[in-house]
Amino acid sequence: VGRQGDALVNTGHALVSAGRLDKGIALLEHGLTKGGLKRPDEARLHLGQAYLQSGNKARAIDSFKAVRGADEAVELARLWEIHARKP
C-alpha cells in the first residue's frame, strides 16, 4: 500500500514540475490519502507548493500547516507558508 502511495506522490510531483498542475495535484492528493508514505511531510510540502503554483493560496497554506515532525520539511513548510501569505 505504501509503495503505491509513494509512486502516486512521486508521479504527481513530476507532473507538477512538468507544468501539469491539475493532474499532478490530483495524484499528490491521492497518494497522501492512501497513506503509508515513506516521507508524508515531504509529500505535504510538495502539495502545498503545487497549490501555490496553481494560485490556490488557501489550500497551499493548509498543506504547509499540516507538515509536522522534526526534520527540515517542517522548517521549509513554515518558510513557504510565509511566502504564501504575501499579497
Predicted ranges, named:
Residues K34-G36, G69-A70:
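Structural marker of alpha-solenoid helical repeat scaffolds
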